[in-house]
Amino acid sequence: MSLFDTINSGGTQLLGVAWPTVWALVRILVVAVVILLCVAYLILWERKLIGWMHVRLGPNRVGPAGLLQPIADVLKLLLKEVIQPAQASRWIYLIAPIMVVVPAFAVWAVIPFQAGAVLGDINAGLLYAMAISSIGVYGVILAGWASNSKYAFLGAMRAAAQMVSYEISMGFALVVVLMTAGTLNLSGIVASQEHGIFASYGLNFLSWNWLPLLPMFVVYFISGIAETNRHPFDVVEGESEIVAGHMIDYSGMAFALFFLAEYINMIVISALAATLFLGGWSAPFGFLSFVPGIVWLVAKVFLLLSVFIWARATFPRYRYDQIMRLGWKIFIPVCVVWLVVVGFWIMSPLNIWK
């Protein structure tokens, strides 16, 4: 009997019919707290890694080796006043940050941490993740519009165009994964990557989707960077052009919610990429299968997040027209071509996903 089965049986005996509701709330709370801690220390890791790339130390004053720096940053933002511009639309101005951060949390309902460990193991998990993650753009648009500032509105318009453009290529990448796995269930997609010619020899990592679907993996990950408005696609909040984009008139915790959503979305994109293309909780080699699946998922997500940060420290910011051209004239045609190629591949005698 697994740990979850033991907890379920004990809780049912203790609380009866109320236990499923209590257990669901406990799991949601645990996942939310862990995500918040991950965001706090992802920001510290970003500052440290970029510091090392710049040949400097990074934050090292608050706590041992700077480990308490995220807590100091949170306290600073909590103590700052939320100053609302006189010309802003009050309620829309206050609702916008919530509309950005809630979808970022909601996506975690369907992401499997290991076999059987998922908040909601629904059959349409992939569709749910794509739909929910698309809602955040409305909060960005409302933030730019409610501030009644030309800089904020320009940033919001850029965000809307950029997110819609790259959602198309991300959607094509997810369709290709759906074609190969034959299911929208994220746990089922991970399970479909655990068998194959290479997996039978213990080389599990060669059976994952990243190898046969490499162009889709690259397109999905780069589109994910653009979706989260991260460097080098951060023209939405381009400091040298429009100050801070849609967040220019926000302060205190309202401002912090936008940053919280950005970093949660980074983790979401990395977790989905690991699940869809890198085998999720699967071990890279058969002899390492004794290691808990969540350890492998965390390791893969950490690696992909480090690539996010490396891109920020390495590449210059694209011009807005270059970003649009990349999405519409390069990524979408590549996705359509590879979609057709994979379709013929699946129908041919050389199908490796049987």
Swiss-Prot record:
Transmembrane segments: 25-45, 91-111, 126-146, 170-190, 205-225, 267-287, 290-310, 330-350
GO-annotated molecular function: NADH dehydrogenase activity; oxidoreductase activity, acting on NAD(P)H, quinone or similar compound as acceptor; quinone binding
Substrates-to-products reaction catalysed: a quinone + NADH + 5 H(+)(in) = a quinol + NAD(+) + 4 H(+)(out)
InterPro entries, per the entry: NADH_UbQ_OxRdtase_su1/FPO (IPR001694), NADH_UbQ_OxRdtase_su1_CS (IPR018086)
Keywords (A to Z) from UniProt: Cell inner membrane, Cell membrane, Membrane, NAD, Quinone, Translocase, Transmembrane, Transmembrane helix, Ubiquinone
Principal subcellular localization: membrane
Membrane topology, record value: Multi-pass membrane protein
EC number(s) reported in the record: 7.1.1.-
A single BP term in Gene Ontology: aerobic respiration
GO cellular component entries: plasma membrane
Location in the cell: Cell inner membrane
Function recorded in the entry: NDH-1 shuttles electrons from NADH, via FMN and iron-sulfur (Fe-S) centers, to quinones in the respiratory chain. The immediate electron acceptor for the enzyme in this species is believed to be ubiquinone. Couples the redox reaction to proton translocation (for every two electrons transferred, four hydrogen ions are translocated across the cytoplasmic membrane), and thus conserves the redox energy in a proton gradient. This subunit may bind ubiquinone.
Subunit annotation: NDH-1 is composed of 14 different subunits. Subunits NuoA, H, J, K, L, M, N constitute the membrane sector of the complex.
UniProt family annotation: Belongs to the complex I subunit 1 family.
HAMAP family, sorted: NDH1_NuoH
The protein's name: NADH-quinone oxidoreductase subunit H
